[in-house]
């Protein structure tokens, strides 16, 4: 059985960060639903797998909300355009991290928490780990500092299950056309992102399911 966030300890919760530090998370508070997140590099097939899972759950009678980060609120849509559009020019790594976490805070307040409190299953395409991997490891910022910022933005809400779709950057690049600003960041950037995702999964224990994403969607 997947452990529920509503049984979190009432005090602070911490786990090891990707570079050996501690990622501190405050209590997530009561919630009745189930929170599932898909993570992975660009080109891993997250959107396809999110849709397949949601269809399967709905066919079994579950009330499912599909969402994504960034961009699933009005504010998030503005932020998504800023951080992904090649026309945005040079954005400093710290500014980028702050923008992604602003999206995250609004997304949790407006979309995720209300749905969980209604008892719904929330399936999100990206969440905190993407911010740690991309804006932390990818942009060579402190992973622990980015993790703490994301924990503050989300009030420490931890998914019940994180599905990490793992694909090597070369294979992922072959799948992508019309690349956005993040997808065009370069091979070394995407290698750091992948390595950090795998490190987060290794340290995160039973909450993670790592799935090789070199396969087709049906496999």
Residue ranges of predicted features:
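Conserved lysine of the Walker
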Residues: 46
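Hydrophobic positions on the alpha1 helix immediately C-terminal to the Walker A/P-loop
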Residues: 49
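NTP-dependent small-molecule kinase module
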Residues: 1-29, 52-54, 170-219
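A glycine- and Lys/Arg-enriched "phosphate-lid" helix/loop adjacent to the NTP-binding pocket
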Residues: 126, 130-196
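ATP-dependent small-molecule kinase phosphotransfer cores
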Residues: 62-154
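Hydrophobic anchor at the beta1->P-loop junction of P-loop NTPases
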Residues: 38
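Walker A (P-loop) phosphate-binding loop of P-loop NTPases
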Residues: 43
């Amino acid at each position: 059985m997947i452990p529920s966030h509503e049984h979190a300890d009432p005090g602070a919760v911490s786990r090891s960060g990707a570079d050996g530090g501690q990622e501190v998370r405050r209590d997530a508070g009561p919630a009745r639903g189930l929170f599932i997140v898909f993570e992975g590099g660009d080109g891993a097939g997250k959107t396809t797998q999110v849709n397949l899972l949601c269809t399967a759950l709905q066919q079994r009678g579950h009330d499912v909300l599909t969402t994504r980060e960034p961009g699933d609120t009005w504010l998030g849509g503005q932020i998504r355009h800023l951080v992904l559009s090649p026309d945005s020019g040079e954005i400093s790594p710290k500014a980028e991290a702050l923008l992604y976490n602003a999206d995250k805070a609004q997304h949790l307040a407006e979309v995720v928490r209300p749905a969980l409190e209604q008892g719904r299953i929330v399936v999100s395409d990206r969440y905190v780990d993407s911010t740690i991997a991309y804006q932390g490891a990818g942009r060579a910022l402190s992973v622990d500092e980015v993790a703490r910022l994301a924990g503050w933005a989300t009030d420490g809400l931890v998914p019940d299950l994180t599905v990490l779709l793992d694909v090597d950057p070369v294979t992922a690049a072959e799948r992508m056309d019309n690349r956005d600003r993040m997808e065009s960041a370069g091979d070394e950037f995407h290698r750091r992102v992948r390595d950090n995702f795998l490190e987060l999964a290794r340290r995160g224990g039973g909450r993670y399911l790592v799935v090789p994403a070199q396969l087709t969607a049906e496999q």
